[in-house]
Regions:
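Active-site pocket-lining/capping segments in soluble small-molecule metabolic enzymes
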Residues: 299-342, 350-352
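N-terminal capping/lid subdomain adjacent to the active-site entrance of alpha/beta enzymes
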Residues: 2-193, 197-202, 206, 210-213, ...
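Hydrophobic alpha-helix feature that most strongly marks membrane-spanning transmembrane helices
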Residues: 287, 291, 307, 313-316, ...
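Short amphipathic alpha-helical face segments that pack within enzyme cores
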Residues: 108, 112, 281, 302-310
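A generic structural signal for well-ordered alpha-helical segments
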Residues: 117-118, 235, 286, 312
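Short, solvent-exposed coil/turn elements at secondary-structure transition points
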Residues: 11-13, 144, 248, 271, ...
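Structural signal for conserved beta-strand scaffold positions within catalytic alpha/beta enzyme cores
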Residues: 140, 267, 322-325
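Catalytic core of soluble alpha/beta enzymes
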Residues: 168, 173-304, 333, 340
């Protein structure tokens, strides 16, 4: 479907978290989020940029994404009307390919244009991506705490809420003992995995092998994102399956990592890889090689959460993702809250994302807004 893009609104919002979320690279108490509203001749669509306030998870950060959109991406789209009219949202990343990196900014822009296109055509996000399930299992990510009793209380509350999989954030000094405590308290039947966010080196292999005793689903991104060969060596030294997150930025990088044995599982985060269309390609590459994938989260609002649920409904997503309910991170979301029932979240079935910002809720958290005519 063709798209005639008239302009894009860049809207910044400030979303306080219900509780601090600590990982190996820092602690978040609020999210500074850039939203994009793409206006076309047929309607509008929404995109959410997952870049954080500081370049800690990746090299991108929210001020930089707004800048690159304003100075480079949007003017380039404005000069590419023929491609957009011919190929719609599928042309966005092709048009922007000459610009190096900035995948989170590209993903947000593609998301907004695709949402507008699908809403105008009456098609759902899930149908466009190739979803085969109407609901998806919901896992939850649990941060680092000051004490093990705190951790156990939080894990227990999430299990009581129905989450079907627990992911523990780990770092040196907070790894084996927290995992041991969770296993001892809640048993071996709870699907459990850990996420290091690049906090270790290959010299820690013997220590990480101690996690083999706990029958974990996986250990996620233990080493630096560029250390593909190190991950391949680690995978040979430990029994716990190695999953890559930060290292996977495209279908090409996924194929390369798979070819050297650096992982047996991939966490697909659409923002990290340049958008949902590239996320589908990574899913296809993994499926062709017999690897499981799952959908990671970036503390999204209901917009990104709905899109992720649709992605997680593709056939190759065989492990529960970080598709948690809105109230996991936000007391009040900007959309109608996404909820879980008996451990599952329904995949939105309406046109486009299937959810929209509620104007009064969006206005209440908006810190700035800029309209750019194309």
């Amino acid at each position: 479907m063709s798209v005639k893009l008239e302009g894009v609104e860049l809207r910044r919002i400030a979303m306080p978290l219900v509780s601090p979320f600590r990982t190996s690279f820092g602690t978040q108490t609020a999210r500074d989020i850039l939203l994009l509203r793409a206006v076309t001749s047929d309607g509008e669509g929404w995109g959410e940029c997952v870049a954080m306030s500081d370049p800690l998870y990746s090299s991108e950060y929210v001020d930089a994404t707004a800048d690159v959109l304003r100075r480079f991406f949007l003017p380039t789209l404005a000069a590419s009307t023929e491609e957009l009219q011919r190929h719609g949202a599928h042309a966005v990343n092709a048009v922007l390919h000459k610009f190096k990196g900035h995948r989170m900014a590209k993903a947000a822009l593609q998301m907004a244009v695709l949402d507008a296109e699908l809403r105008a055509d009456g098609r759902s996000w899930a149908r466009e991506l190739g979803a085969v399930h109407e609901r998806v299992p919901s896992g939850v990510s649990v941060g680092i705490f000051d004490s093990i009793p705190q951790l156990l209380d939080v894990v227990g509350s999430y299990l009581d809420a129905g989450y079907v999989r627990i992911k523990l954030k780990i770092e040196p000094g907070w790894d084996v003992e927290p995992v041991r405590a969770v296993r001892e308290r809640f048993g071996d039947d709870v699907p459990l995995q850990v996420d290091a966010n690049t906090a270790y080196t290959l010299r820690d292999a013997r220590h990480l092998a101690k996690l083999d005793d706990f029958d974990l689903l996986l250990i996620e991104q233990p080493l630096e994102e560029e250390d593909i060969l190190g991950h391949a060596e680690l995978a040979r030294l430990i029994k716990t399956p190695v999953c890559l997150d930060e290292s996977i930025v495209s279908a090409q990088s996924a194929a390369a990592a798979i070819s050297v044995g650096a992982c047996s599982i991939i966490n697909i985060k659409p923002g990290r890889v340049g958008g949902y269309l590239e996320a589908v390609r990574i899913h296809d590459v993994a499926a062709a090689h017999g690897l499981a994938v799952w959908c990671g989260g970036m503390v999204e609002t209901g917009l990104g959460r709905a899109a992720n649920a649709a992605l997680a409904a593709l056939p190759g997503f065989t492990l529960p993702g970080d598709i948690s309910a809105s109230d996991r991170f936000y007391r009040t979301d900007i959309t109608a809250p996404l909820t879980i029932s008996e451990g599952y979240m329904d995949v939105p079935a309406g046109p486009g994302l299937g959810v929209s910002p509620i104007p009064e809720l969006l206005d209440a958290v908006t810190t700035s807004s800029e309209w750019i005519t194309l």
